[in-house]
Protein backbone atom coordinates (compact mmCIF):
# COMPACT_ATOMS: atom_id res chain seq x y z
CA UNK A 1 0.00 0.00 0.00
CA UNK A 2 2.92 2.33 0.65
CA UNK A 3 4.13 1.87 -2.92
CA UNK A 4 0.76 2.97 -4.28
CA UNK A 5 0.77 6.05 -2.04
CA UNK A 6 4.16 7.05 -3.43
CA UNK A 7 2.94 6.42 -6.98
CA UNK A 8 -0.01 8.77 -6.40
CA UNK A 9 2.26 11.56 -5.47
CA UNK A 10 4.32 11.07 -8.52
CA UNK A 11 1.23 10.88 -10.73
CA UNK A 12 0.01 14.14 -9.23
CA UNK A 13 3.12 15.88 -10.44
CA UNK A 14 3.17 14.18 -13.79
CA UNK A 15 -0.62 14.10 -14.25
CA UNK A 16 -0.55 13.29 -17.87
CA UNK A 17 3.04 12.51 -18.04
CA UNK A 18 2.61 8.92 -16.89
CA UNK A 19 -0.81 8.37 -18.43
Swiss-Prot record:
It is found in: Secreted. GO terms for cellular component: extracellular region. The keyword Oxidoreductase does not apply. Its main location: secreted. The keyword Cytoplasm does not apply. Keywords: Neurotoxin, Secreted, Toxin. One of its GO terms (molecular function) is toxin activity. Expressed by the venom gland. Belongs to the scolopendra toxin 3 family. This is Scolopendra 5848.46 Da toxin. It comes from Scolopendra angulata.
Amino acid sequence: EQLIKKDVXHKDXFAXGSE
